[in-house]
Amino acid sequence: EKHKADLEKYRDRLIFADDVIVAFQNLAHGVYLGWNKPVVAVTGSAGKTTARELTAHVLASSGRKVLRSIKNYNNGLGLPITVLNLAKDNSYDIAVLEMGMSTPNNEIARLCRITPPDVSVVLNVLPVHIEHLGSLENIAKAKAELVEELKTDGTAVLNADDSSVFSMRDLHKGRIVSYGIENQADVMAKNIRFDRFGETHFTLHTPEGESQALLPLNGRHNILNCLAAAAVGHIFGMTTHQIAASLHTVAPPPNRG
């Protein structure tokens, strides 16, 4: 307020706002409304960036033009920065957006109001940021906002091997697609084998069928991340064979395992 008088001479090129961050978010929401195509939102205590990249890769392999979060920009400033790219290029067919939180202040719910998700992917609930949220239960409640904010006709993609995540299925009356390794799920990896080259071989199972898959990444966590991506591909009409073929060409994001 004290600088407002100094800025008056620039009024023809400035917009005054009571809260610059809220105004920035509202601007991004307006750009989203003008674009109005599917949004896949991804959250979890770990693996968000890898799962987001895998999901974007799988969808792009089907010929779709995919907007994805810039770097790990997943908060109230980072998400709008990504979304505003639609103002200069609205030819994207779909957006895969990472949504994070670190405090018990409805962060994810507020992010969802900028870009309401058509598909919400919840990866896991782990004691990350527990110093701010107090308990694993509170972390789960915060992550669950991604499911609660789903569009009525949206789809929740939930990790069946994480009980805190899988219990979120009760929060959405619409479609649920589960994925997992240990527990029975809609999308699964079976007959898993790790080779000496750091690659993972498995049978990919979806409701559409089965196909042999080769993932050039190692570790159970990466299998789960690719199953989340496979579930999204299935939701958008890809065959199991198409999804498995796309996994063969993925690469880990920089500095990610």
What residues fall within each predicted segment?
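Phosphate-binding loop of NTP-binding sites
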Residues: A23-A156, F166-H172, G233
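A generic helix-loop boundary/linker signal
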Residues: A17-D18, S69, Y73, G219, ...
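General small-molecule cofactor/ligand-binding pocket signal
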Residues: I15, L67, V177
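N-terminal pre-Walker A segment at the start of P-loop NTPase domains
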Residues: D12-V22
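A short glycine-rich beta-strand->turn/loop micro-motif centered on a GG-aromatic cluster
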Residues: E1-K2, R68-Y73, I243
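Acidic, Mg2+-coordinating active-site environments of NTP-dependent enzymes
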Residues: H3-D12, D118-G257
